[in-house]
């Protein structure tokens, strides 16, 4: 007589405590749970946020450091940028990140964009970690980053209160043609630029606790070389050197 071994001993197959129906039910339940788990994984395969657009024409792709968003720590996403997949902060402009040398023993010359001085600079990359402000050569760095601040000035978006909305752009390079990434009542949006004086406005603060009433609408309303800049409200400011 056939029996089934359990922790408590043996049950005959014709025993009332054993049933092929029970086996079939458990098998179907297991398959259903696996299918549900697979569907949930498929639905939740992306973390919030948008990856930056690829800015280079890639003739050779570099080895990927991730395959999906969940290969990346915390809120980072797996993005294709500078000819390879890498973990990136979807809420920061890559070319504005500080230089990161990495923490392995290998050394190779790479290039990063020095946003403060507005130029591409070489550095020694140690091969692990780091960030997305990391390019194989100077040409790639310049192509990816030199247009992150386009000529022109953001137009006025009159508002007394600001809502925190997901940004539709992170920097000017995310916007088509001559449009700029501008502060609006609801996050940052691409907008047609105004004609401006030479120089660039100081960097915008990450967060404004209060939006001041506009002191100007465009550069022509500011004295001498001052520019009309968006800095928690429009105001005349000395251009960034």
UniProtKB/Swiss-Prot annotation:
Coiled-coil residue windows: none
Record-annotated BPTI/Kunitz inhibitor domain positions: 95-145
Gene source species: Homo sapiens (Human)
Disulfide bonds: 51-79, 58-83, 66-78, 72-87, 95-145, 104-128, 120-141, 154-182, 165-186, 169-181, 175-190, 201-229, 208-232, 216-228, 222-236
WAP domain residues: 44-91, 147-194, 195-240
Protein name, UniProt field: WAP four-disulfide core domain protein 8
Molecular-function annotations in GO: serine-type endopeptidase inhibitor activity
Gene (UniProt): WFDC8
UniProt cross-references to SUPFAM superfamilies, sorted A to Z: BPTI-like, Elafin-like
Subcellular location: Secreted
Tissue note: Expressed ubiquitously, the highest levels are found in the epididymis followed by testis and trachea.
Top-level taxon: Eukaryota
Signal peptide positions on this chain: 1-38
Pfam family, one: WAP
């Amino acid at each position: 007589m056939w029996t089934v071994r359990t922790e408590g001993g043996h049950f005959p197959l014709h025993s009332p405590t054993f049933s092929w129906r029970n086996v079939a039910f458990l098998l179907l339940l297991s398959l259903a749970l696996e299918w549900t788990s697979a569907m949930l994984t498929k639905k939740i395969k992306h973390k919030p946020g948008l990856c930056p657009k690829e800015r280079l024409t890639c003739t050779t792709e570099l080895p990927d450091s991730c395959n999906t968003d969940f290969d990346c720590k915390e809120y980072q996403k797996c993005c294709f940028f500078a000819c390879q997949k890498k973990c990136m902060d979807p809420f920061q402009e890559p070319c504005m990140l500080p230089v990161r040398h990495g923490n392995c023993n290998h050394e190779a010359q790479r290039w990063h964009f020095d946003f403060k001085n507005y130029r591409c600079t070489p550095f020694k990359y140690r091969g692990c970690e780091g960030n997305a402000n990391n390019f194989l050569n100077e040409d790639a760095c310049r192509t990816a980053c030199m247009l992150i601040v386009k000529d022109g000035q953001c137009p006025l978006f009159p508002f007394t209160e600001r809502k925190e909305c997901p940004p539709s752009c992170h920097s000017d390079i995310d916007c088509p043609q001559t449009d700029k990434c501008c502060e609006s009542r609801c996050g940052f949006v691409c907008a047609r630029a105004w004609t401006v004086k030479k120089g660039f406005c100081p960097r915008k603060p990450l967060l404004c606790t209060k939006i001041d009433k506009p002191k100007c609408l465009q550069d022509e309303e500011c004295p001498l070389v001052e520019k009309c800049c968006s800095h928690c409200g429009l105001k005349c400011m000395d251009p960034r050197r």
